[in-house]
């Protein structure tokens, strides 16, 4: 589970301007952190299909934001996936 300090750190690292919390970069970074956190949960709870559905929803939401960013600005998209080590 991400703490408030973890979220603030992620926001600071990815924001485009001061106070920016809604840009695609920030949203994708936060979703990536939540997804990575959930993957550890599934190593110990392999049959937790209820949470797995939530994970798939998060992955889908991140994919949509990445597609949006790719359409708007390819360079920002490429730098973000390289920074977050996301496969594409």
UniProtKB/Swiss-Prot annotation:
Keywords of this entry: Ribonucleoprotein, Ribosomal protein, RNA-binding, rRNA-binding
Keyword Cell membrane on entry: no
One GO biological process term: translation
Gene Ontology terms, MF aspect: rRNA binding; structural constituent of ribosome
Keyword Nucleotide-binding (UniProt): no
Source species, domain of life: Bacteria
Annotated GO CC locations: cytosolic small ribosomal subunit
HAMAP family on file: Ribosomal_uS15_B
Function: One of the primary rRNA binding proteins, it binds directly to 16S rRNA where it helps nucleate assembly of the platform of the 30S subunit by binding and bridging several RNA helices of the 16S rRNA.
Family indicated by similarity: Belongs to the universal ribosomal protein uS15 family.
NCBIfam families registered for this protein in UniProt: S15_bact (TIGR00952)
Subunit text: Part of the 30S ribosomal subunit. Forms a bridge to the 50S subunit in the 70S ribosome, contacting the 23S rRNA.
Protein name as it appears in the record: Small ribosomal subunit protein uS15
Protein's organism: Francisella tularensis subsp. novicida (strain U112)
Gene: rpsO
